[in-house]
UniProtKB/Swiss-Prot annotation:
It comes from Salmonella paratyphi B (strain ATCC BAA-1250 / SPB7). It catalyses: N(2)-acetyl-L-ornithine + H2O = L-ornithine + acetate. The lineage of its organism: Bacteria, Pseudomonadati, Pseudomonadota, Gammaproteobacteria, Enterobacterales. NCBIfam families: AcOrn-deacetyl, PRK05111.1. SUPFAM superfamilies: Bacterial exopeptidase dimerisation domain, Zn-dependent exopeptidases. InterPro entries: AcOrn-deacetyl, ArgE/DapE_CS, Bact_exopeptidase_dim_dom, Peptidase_M20, Peptidase_M20_dimer, Peptidase_M20A. Homodimer. Belongs to the peptidase M20A family. ArgE subfamily. GO terms for cellular component: cytoplasm. This is Acetylornithine deacetylase. The gene is argE.
Length: 383
């Protein structure tokens, strides 16, 4: 059965040629059903049992779980099937045609991160999966680039408890054991419109927001002073004011003002605690102007994540790669997988190429990635 698998580069080519864009804007959002069908067929050909799982609350999106072996524990290799949208005017190549040039593989998803599944399939084509002593699971998730709905749903519904998991995000084969979380909120102030010639007849939402921003900046300074994790390049929680809009005319008292902001918490900081700190910071404004200020989520929050540095997974991977694990400021699906088992983020390609025009993966990653997957499968599923 295994000899029916296409060559590595043809698997890669087929994955890139199958669009699976995730976007909050409905006109850009795409189902990943075709890509899931491709993966399900290939893993079935390798002898895996394959389950396709609809993801609730999405626009026709699916997870795929391929499993082989029996018993408890084992290894989970996982990644997301979706990509970000692309700016056609900034790409010099067809995003959906895998192009090899100057020791690089170009295409949307080559690094982030559909290509990871080509590496898994290629590494397993010569493995007799019926002889594994522990289970091997391959998970392909949906909607990582927007809501992380696939990983959230899987982690909430699965009974699986592998020994460990590896998420193949592009880390330049540098193992990552911790990252910050992400909370994005909209602060909305409702004023009362009126003619600017008589300020007393209205409530200016921009002025109230100015007061609110002052308190938010105090919270930012407090987070920086109170919380530290020196392994991060930015060793404290960050708070960013990303977008503000209010009013519609210079001669009209502003009736509504909105601020979009985010906080990136350190591992160990709970989302409930952070929301409480934000509400406490804004309490003076709310008390002075009852009913005029609200805070709501822009996107589902992502907690910070950390894999214990002394876990066997960390020790094994550090030994195989000859390098220490690191921490990063960006987010992945790791917090959700970590609820099931100790998890590392580790994959080919550079995060610097993610979400960029002319995205590419350097071919120098091909051999070591295939070897790494072979080694971790052997260690965690054969011993």
């Amino acid at each position: 059965m295994k000899n029916v698998l296409p060559p590595f580069i043809e698997i890669y080519r087929a994955l890139i040629a199958t669009p699976s864009i995730s976007a909050t804007e409905e006109s850009l959002d795409q189902s990943n059903a075709s890509l899931i069908t491709l993966l399900a067929g290939w893993f079935s050909d390798l002898g895996f049992n394959v389950e396709v799982q609809p993801v609730p609350g999405t626009r026709n999106k699916f997870n795929m779980l391929a499993s082989t072996g029996h018993g408890a524990g084992g290894l989970l290799l996982t990644g997301h099937t979706d990509t970000v949208p692309f700016d056609d005017g900034r790409w010099t190549r067809d995003p959906f045609t895998l192009t090899e040039h100057d020791n690089k593989l170009y295409g949307l998803g080559t690094a982030d991160m559909k290509g990871f599944f080509a590496f898994i399939l290629d590494a397993l084509r010569d493995v007799d999966v019926t002889k594994l002593k522990k289970p091997l699971y391959i998970l392909a998730t949906a909607d990582e680039e927007t809501s992380m709905a696939g990983a959230r749903y899987f982690s909430e519904t699965t009974a699986l408890r592998p020994d460990c998991a590896i998420i193949g995000e592009p880390t330049s084969l540098q193992p990552i054991r911790a990252h910050k979380g992400h909370i994005s909120n909209v602060v909305r102030v409702l004023g009362q419109s009126g003619h600017s010639s008589d300020p007393a007849r209205g409530v200016n939402a921009i002025e109230l927001m100015h007061d609110a921003i002052g308190h938010i900046m105090q919270l930012r300074d407090s987070l920086k002073a109170r919380y530290h994790y020196e392994a991060f390049t930015v060793p404290y929680p960050t708070l960013n004011l990303g977008h503000i809009h209010g009013g519609d005319a210079s001669n009209r008292i502003c009736a509504c003002c909105e601020l979009h902001m985010d906080i990136r918490p350190l591992p160990g900081m709970t989302l409930n605690d952070l929301n409480g700190l934000l509400n406490d910071a804004l309490a003076p404004v709310s008390e002075r102007w009852p009913g005029r200020l609200t805070v709501a989520e822009l996107h589902p929050p992502i907690p910070g994540y950390e894999c214990p540095p002394d876990h066997q997974l960390v020790e094994v991977v550090e030994k195989l790669l000859g390098t220490k694990t690191d921490v990063v400021n960006y987010c992945t699906e790791a917090p959700f997988m970590q609820t099931l088992c100790p998890t590392l983020v580790l994959g080919p390609g550079s995060i610097n190429q993610a979400h960029q025009p002319d995205e590419y993966l350097e071919t120098r990653f091909i051999k070591p990635t295939r070897e790494l997957i072979t080694q971790v499968v052997h260690h965690f599923c054969w011993h």
